[in-house]
Design a protein with these regions (language model features):
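Non-catalytic accessory segments flanking enzymatic or RNA/DNA-binding domains
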Residues: 1-156
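Conserved RecA-like P-loop NTPase helicase motor core
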Residues: 39, 523-641
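A short beta-strand-to-loop transition that corresponds to the Sensor-1 phosphate-sensing loop
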Residues: 41-43, 212, 261-265, 290, ...
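Long, largely alpha-helical accessory region at the distal end of helicase-like NTP-driven motors
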Residues: 112-149, 435-462, 622-695
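Catalytic P-loop NTPase motifs of RecA-like helicase/translocase cores
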Residues: 267, 293-295, 351-352, 583, ...
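Substrate-gripping "pore-loop 1 plus following alpha2 helix"
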Residues: 293-331, 359-360, 365, 370-375, ...
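Interdomain helical connector at the RecA1-RecA2 junction of SF1/SF2 helicase-like NTPases
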Residues: 341, 352-490
Length: 695
């Protein structure tokens, strides 16, 4: 990618940060003369210094250096402090040294200089090589077991917005409400929060129903790991099949139960026989993981009909066990369950909220991702000035910022789509990625070849940086993305199962011709035969983890699989290559990127938590769709809160764009979208006449 040809690239340089190595920083301030403040940070130093400027407006940065021995071993600012005090006899600032009203931190050192920090780091590194125990080192190789936080006995603490949801649940139940909705964005912690609701009503039998089998482990981990739920036993379909009296047997021993079933478990008479005991019992709390149920209900109904997909592709999708649900049958089974209280969980309840099923008194939580980010920022503002607080003590630490690229496709693809539209094709974007055969073609391998291979190859080449296009950034060749270790594990969302096969074939066949795409291992999880290779979601997760452990980048090819309810912590980039008009399907997909991905490095006396995914990238090749989805979500929020009116809607959109910026490229010029500025409104209109820049 030739940065010299791109106007206003500095906008992108400012926004893209990526993974940040830990740094030692130092500053001086005229309010504490002759003292040097020495600290460390796991975010950009400039960001940390701006937070300190609240207390020291005139501070001047004096020093910045990495707090790293090697990629697996870090040190803290405590090691620098130790050297300054013990080796150089530098005195720490004391409260009595300050005039009244000046903020106190004990990390100021009298007459310390930047050269002293250099000497300290040199001594720290030499001591490490000599295997000395002088300093404390933090290593990922000796890190605390990842299951540490899930050992029974550890009490998990509700975050403020989770506690608010539980309090609202209690009030609603006390007021006689029996059909409740917890609307909270993916990654909120709905399983933990809803089980805390079960505790509050002393529920003996809790039934959790989900459309996705792979979320079972999340529920199991929560029930069996958190000390909060020590009275509960986790049961699943297998346990009920082993013993028809599994529930009664546990209740006789005064144990409470949380039963997890999938919608597939509820389908079919033979399976239902295994659950006779369950259907006889009074369920104290029925938790319906509506996040996934609602998304599937829509995606296999209207989406397949209205987004231009071939109906024959539904059979390919249904071959994948974790995708095959008869929603109507499952819904009927849910109605038969005798539940005292029903709690629906959803991160994308847009259709539900625009209906009449839930009144405002039934909605116990209304949390979007921007709300989590604001809580994260507020916590930092109120706590990071304290000497004993670490950045990772923030309960929201590690929630990534999503940077959104709203790009038009390459020129030849745009022209092809224009031709398709003129011929009467409504969903030209999905049609662009149509393979020669939707079904498996054993004669000509048509399911492994795109009808428009030339155009798609050129699109990939521009993304890769091996070709240029004035309206599309070759972001894989952008230096800040490479330096920030972004785009390591990408997801391509494609319209047909066979599109995944065709993409795999194209990327593999021309691997050596790409500058960057050739470095990726292709993981095809939705192809015509994908179910044979990756039978279970954990097979997919394990494959990606193995690649990351081997320092290999990956591209996962999917249609719908793993895009609702699944967590692949390494995923950091999504390329959206299909049509959809469903805010639910769209958000379910893109928020797969927004999980925390944290590495723990430990020493004998403590640990460091490193954020491996500070930013994610959504690349949407339909700018109009991205803007439309943004507006619809903000409008739905407005309608369902007290914040009505156009001014409030504008404020919400402005805040969303601050938290998750949108970047466009037009005629080799980068723009950050501000929908309230006339220039961006003009560009937005230009994007709405999709692919028009070439005409």
């Amino acid at each position: 990618m030739d940065k010299m040809k791109i106007e206003a690239i500095d906008i992108l340089d400012r926004i893209i940060i990526g993974r940040v190595d830990p740094h030692i920083y130092a500053f001086t301030t005229n309010t504490v003369p002759n003292y040097l403040k020495v600290g460390d940070t796991y975010r950009p130093v400039s960001q940390r210094l701006n937070e300190w400027r609240v207390f020291f407006p005139e501070l001047e940065k004096q020093y910045e250096n990495k707090a790293i021995i090697d990629e697996e071993t870090y040190f803290r600012d405590y090691a620098i402090h130790q050297y300054l005090e013990n080796d150089l006899n530098k005195k720490r600032l004391k409260p009595e040294d300050l005039e009244d009203g000046i903020y106190y931190s004990r990390e100021f050192f009298k007459e310390a200089e930047t050269g002293d920090i250099d000497n300290a780091i040199e001594d720290i590194k030499e001591s490490y090589q000599a295997n000395s125990s002088k300093y404390e080192y933090y290593s990922s190789k000796n890190r605390l077991p990842q299951t540490f936080h899930y050992q029974r006995g550890e009490q998990w603490t509700l975050r403020p917005n989770q506690k608010s949801a539980v309090d609202s649940f209690i009030r609603a139940v006390e007021n006689g409400r029996r059909n409740l909705l917890m609307y909270a964005v993916m990654r909120f912690g709905k399983s933990f929060t809803s089980l805390c609701c079960a505790l509050e009503i002393s529920a003996n039998i809790v039934l959790v129903v989900s459309a996705k089998a792979d979320v079972k482990d999340e529920w199991k981990k929560t029930v069996e790991g958190a000390g909060n739920f020590s009275e509960y036993v986790f049961l699943e379909a297998y346990d009920l099949a082993l013993s028809e009296n599994a529930i009664k047997a546990n209740r006789k021993e005064n144990k409470k139960v949380v039963i997890f079933l999938t919608l597939q478990d509820l389908q079919g008479n033979a399976i239902k026989d295994k659950h006779k005991e369950l259907f006889k019992e009074q369920i104290d709390l029925l938790i319906i993981d509506e996040t996934h149920f609602g998304a599937r209900a829509e995606s296999f109904g209207k989406i397949l009909e209205n987004a231009g997909y071939e109906k024959s592709d539904k059979s390919n999708i249904n071959k994948l066990d974790d995708e095959n649900i008869d929603v109507n049958v499952a819904e009927e089974e849910l109605k038969q369950i005798n539940a005292r209280i029903r709690l629906h969980l959803s991160g994308t309840p847009y259709r539900i909220l625009m209906g009449s099923e839930f009144e405002k008194e039934d909605i116990i939580s209304f949390v979007q991702f921007s709300d989590i980010v604001k809580e994260q920022e507020e916590w930092d503002k109120n706590n990071l000035n304290k000497d004993d607080i670490n950045e990772w003590d923030n309960p929201y630490y590690g929630f990534p910022q999503m940077v959104r690229f709203a790009f038009n496709p390459n020129k030849s693809s745009c022209e092809k789509m224009e031709a398709l539209k003129r011929s009467g094709v409504t969903f030209a974007f999905s049609k662009l990625f149509e393979p020669e055969s939707i079904k498996k073609d054993t004669v000509n391998n048509g399911h492994k070849k795109f009808k428009n291979e030339t155009e798609i190859l050129e699109l990939l080449q521009v993304i890769d940086g091996s070709k240029e296009d004035e309206n599309l950034l070759g972001f894989l060749d952008y230096d800040k993305i490479k330096e920030g270790k972004m785009c390591r594990h990408m997801v391509m969302v494609l319209p047909y199962c066979a599109s995944c096969d065709a993409m795999e074939e194209l990327l593999s066949k021309l691997k050596d011709t790409f500058k960057n795409l050739g470095e990726y291992e292709i993981i095809n999880i939705s192809g015509v035969d994908a179910g044979r290779i990756y039978k279970k979601p954990n097979d997919i997760k394990n494959k990606i983890k193995e690649c990351e452990d081997s320092n290999k980048k990956t591209i996962t090819l999917t249609v719908n699989r793993m895009l609702t309810g699944s967590t692949v912590e390494q995923w950091d980039t999504m390329l959206y290559f299909k049509d959809t008009s469903s805010p639910q399907e769209y958000d379910q997909s893109i928020f797969r990127l927004q999980n925390q991905y944290i590495r723990t490095l430990s020493s004998a006396n403590g640990f460091i938590k490193e954020n491996l995914k500070p930013q994610t990238l959504l690349v949407d090749f339909d700018p109009d769709r991205l803007f439309r989805m943004q507006e619809q979500k903000s409008l739905i929020y407005n309608v369902n809160t007290e914040e009505n009116g156009n001014s409030k809607l504008k404020e919400r959109i402005v805040e969303e764009l601050r938290i998750s910026p949108v970047i466009m490229m037009n005629h080799n010029k980068i723009k950050e979208v501000d929908l309230l500025r006339s220039e961006e409104r003009r560009v937005g209109k230009e994007c709405r006449s999709r692919w028009s820049p070439y005409h």
